[in-house]
Amino acid sequence: VIHTVGPIWNGGRNREEELLANCYFNSMKLAMDNGIRSIAFPSISTGAYGFPVELAANIAVHTVNRFLQDNLNSFDLVEWVLFDTHTESVYEAAEKSYMEDESDDFDF
């Protein structure tokens, strides 16, 4: 188990976005450095800490996917563990948006 403590949302005035991204990045780095091949994440900071779900999902999806691109074959499995259908649909939309943005980067 790798434990991370997410930032408390304070309107975005205290680098919360950067801190949240670091939670995902550092957890993945620690797992990779210790030979852990699977990892599961909740929606960090979106409960009691009040981070907006849509923003948190975009940060999470972007950070995790960029890490995987930069560290090919580092994980066999990465999963989201989401506790309600609203959060699940927000993460699905963030994944779809990320993939569409990535496909726009290809030049032929």
Regions found by a protein language model. Give the residues of each.
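Glycine/small-residue-rich phosphate/adenosyl-binding loop
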Residues: V1-P7
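Phosphate/ribose-phosphate-bearing ligand recognition and processing surfaces
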Residues: I8-F108
